Regions:
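Short, hydrophobic beta-strand segments that form beta-sheet elements in well-ordered domains
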Residues: 40-44, 101-103, 150
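Short, well-ordered alpha-helices that flank and scaffold nucleotide-derived cofactor binding pockets
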Residues: 26, 30-34, 55, 89-93, ...
Length: 295
């Protein structure tokens, strides 16, 4: 219990420095400041970006890497994925004893990003918000809804989690070996869905819609479906011809598509059948599987 209170006390008094003044760095810094966490300031190789971020978050512009490292207990390296280790290599010979070094990459583990960190007496963490940070100056408003996934040194993991628990965020730990698969899951849900919607829009345009009117027409079913999935899960949200094992309609769909579109339709329908079988254990999907080339 005393250890918990010590950890909680350390979180409250933690001084956090942000290296990299892009969308994620700006959003995190603003979010921390609004919740009365101590942000030492911003450092970026592009001084103008760091100055803008410091002004926006009402913190301090810091001129050099050594200073921000020296005055911070925790450092967030919010730079592009391929630069994280580059920045780390510039820091690792500084005095890092007892400091927490964090990055926000979804795919990189702390060990991959910060090679040799254990020899420096510092502790490495990947802290990934499951959230699309798309707007440098507005995304912070939505960060309270984000789910943070943390991976790294178990010794002080609770303190890193405590930062976000104290802000009301949900937090989950993940093993380093699962980082890439976890990131792939997030990408499918966030990015690949966009590709499917584009496919749908393209088909609508072949029927005479322009993209704007197609999007307006499809928005209610897209948004409604996402809401249902979020609230009730995929099994309870699935409807449509594949779920009903409506062979005739599926055949017609396949006939109106080109070869590439058919391939996508077939692959996705396989997944829909597996969901349909959970929803309707007594329904026979045999003929449908045959038509889709599954059997």
């Amino acid at each position: 219990d005393s250890e918990y209170h010590h950890a909680k006390g350390r979180v409250i008094n933690m001084r956090t420095g942000i290296i990299g003044a892009g969308k994620v760095g700006c959003s995190l810094g603003k979010y921390f400041r609004l919740n009365n966490l101590k942000v030492t300031g911003y450092y970026d190789v592009n001084e103008n970006l760091a100055k803008e971020a410091a002004t926006f978050t009402e913190t301090t512009f810091i001129e050099d890497l050594e200073t921000i490292v020296k005055i911070s207990d925790t450092l967030f390296l919010t730079v592009p994925d391929d630069l994280i280790t580059t920045v780390w290599n510039q820091m690792k010979d500084m005095s890092l004893e007892g400091k927490f070094i964090c990055h926000c990459s979804g795919a990189l583990s702390a060990g991959d990003a910060f090679p040799g960190i254990d020899k420096c007496g510092a502790f490495g963490y990947s802290v990934h918000p499951l959230f699309a940070v798309s707007d440098k100056y507005n995304s912070y408003k939505e960060l309270s809804h984000a789910y943070f996934v943390i991976e790294g040194d178990e010794k002080h993991r609770e303190e890193i989690a405590g930062i976000f628990n104290n802000l009301g965020n949900e937090v989950r730990y993940i093993a380093a070996k699962d980082k890439v698969k976890y990131h792939c899951a997030a990408a499918v849900c966030s990015n690949h869905v966009v590709a499917l919607i584009q496919e749908s829009l393209d088909l609508m345009q072949e029927c005479g819609f322009d993209e704007e009117s197609a999007l307006k027409a499809l928005a209610p079913i897209m948004l409604g479906n996402m809401q249902h999935i979020a609230e009730r899960g995929t099994v309870n949200s699935l409807t449509g011809p594949v779920e009903r094992a409506d062979v005739k309609t599926v055949e017609k769909h396949l006939n109106c598509l080109d070869e590439k579109q058919q391939m996508l339709y077939r692959l996705l329908s396989e997944v829909l059948i597996s969901i349909g079988e959970k929803k309707n254990p007594g329904r026979d999907y045999g003929r449908l599987k045959h038509i889709l080339g599954n059997e």
